[in-house]
């Protein structure tokens, strides 16, 4: 027996002398290489640009053209980076366990088993809650920033959605530098609608002695749209013309939303924001107003309906045309002088038609493929 032990000892020493590496040394080298690879990957991401606004770190999101969009994109980017870091850690620990804590083929011994380690288990339980709390905090901070409203925006826009297009009206323009002011409320049309509604509401049910409510949210059946706004300068889309909403850069803009029929959704991908457009917003308890601090650059940005609303929902597009404040005031002057939207755009040197999308074909009988010829 002693001879056998001496033989094993001699063989082990001989293997070390000819360069066999201990298992612990191999594990250390693998750990160092893995750490180096992770470090290089993180370094590459950080030095790829001083800003996280690049195609790799946006992870599929648009860059955004408003301060609100930038904050949401940054939240998205850092959330993904945190998720990736946690994924690398979890998968790394998993593969480490699989590779280095398995039973060796030629060894009768099982790997060391680690269980019922209360401090370790409490740590693993607490870490996910900490991560969730941190993400929740930053989500609430960004959400509150996006939903903030000021009392006196520079431009107030009425947005009316209907199957399957849009109407935009300029309700009020008040540049704080005193450069331009405009009250676009069409009081005649709005007062007529409210007068009709008031007349109906004052009708008395002679049988019960109280006002007679209408069939639609208490309103008359032929006057369910009295909640809509009307403006003297409006742009209405048609099946042959995409509505172009002209807005100034560098100004606080408020959007007041309402639908004339079913539920729609106002969505400009470059705003990284969408909001449901409800009929009867007040009765439906919906917040139909949102603001953007500014549009940071000029350009044409496609807008879409993001709520399934019927046959041509997928083609219910519009365009936001961001121009300088000087061009915007000239555009409004052209519209107030009686020019159409296309004519006013051409007058300020802009394309008179949408450049980010195109009109749709409303012919329900059109076919995408030619019918086979008769033999």
From Swiss-Prot:
Membrane protein topology class: Multi-pass membrane protein
GO CC terms of this entry: plasma membrane
Superkingdom to which the source organism belongs: Bacteria
Region span, Disordered: 353-375
EC number(s) per entry: 7.1.1.9
UniProt biased composition (Polar residues): 353-363
Enzyme class: translocase
Catalytic activity: 4 Fe(II)-[cytochrome c] + O2 + 8 H(+)(in) = 4 Fe(III)-[cytochrome c] + 2 H2O + 4 H(+)(out)
Any one biological process term the GO annotation gives: ATP synthesis coupled electron transport
Signal peptide: none
Localisation: Cell membrane
Protein name per its UniProtKB record: Probable cytochrome c oxidase subunit 2
Lineage of the organism: Bacteria, Bacillati, Actinomycetota, Actinomycetes, Mycobacteriales
Gene: ctaC
């Amino acid at each position: 027996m002693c001879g056998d032990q001496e033989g094993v000892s001699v063989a082990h020493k001989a293997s070390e002398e000819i360069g066999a590496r201990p298992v612990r040394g191999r594990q250390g080298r693998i750990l160092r290489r893995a750490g180096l690879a992770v470090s290089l990957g993180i370094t590459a991401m950080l030095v790829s640009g001083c800003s996280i606004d690049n195609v790799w770190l946006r992870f599929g999101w648009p860059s955004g053209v408003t301060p609100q969009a930038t904050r949401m994109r940054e939240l998205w980017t850092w959330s993904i980076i945190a998720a990736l870091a946690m994924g690398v850690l979890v998968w790394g620990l998993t593969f480490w366990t699989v590779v280095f804590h398995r039973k060796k083929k030629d060894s009768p011994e099982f790997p060391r088993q680690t269980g019922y380690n209360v401090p370790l288990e409490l740590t693993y339980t607490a870490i996910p809650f900490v991560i969730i709390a941190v993400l929740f905090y930053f989500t609430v901070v960004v959400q509150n920033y996006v939903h903030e409203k000021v009392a006196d925006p520079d431009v107030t826009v009425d947005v009316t959605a209907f199957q399957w297009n849009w109407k935009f009206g300029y309700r009020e323009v008040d540049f704080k530098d005193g450069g331009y002011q405009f009250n676009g409320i069409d009081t005649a049309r709005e007062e007529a609608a409210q007068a009709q509604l008031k007349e109906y509401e004052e009708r008395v049910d002679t049988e019960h002695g109280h006002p007679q409510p209408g069939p639609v949210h208490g309103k008359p059946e032929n006057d369910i749209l009295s909640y809509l706004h009307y403006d003297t300068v409006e742009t209405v889309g048609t099946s042959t013309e995409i509505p172009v909403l002209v807005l100034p850069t560098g100004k606080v803009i408020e959007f007041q939303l309402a639908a004339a029929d079913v539920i729609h959704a106002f969505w400009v991908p470059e705003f990284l924001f969408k909001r449901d457009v409800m009929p009867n917003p007040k009765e439906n308890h919906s917040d139909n107003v949102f603001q953007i601090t500014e549009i940071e650059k000029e350009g044409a940005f496609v807008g879409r309906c993001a709520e399934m609303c019927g046959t041509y929902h997928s083609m219910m597009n519009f365009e936001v045309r961001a121009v300088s404040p000087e061009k915007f005031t000239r555009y409004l002057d052209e519209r107030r002088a009686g020019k159409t939207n296309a004519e006013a755009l051409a007058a300020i040197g802009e394309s008179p038609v949408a450049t980010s999308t195109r009109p749709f074909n409303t012919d329900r009988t059109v076919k995408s493929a030619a019918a086979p010829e008769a033999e």
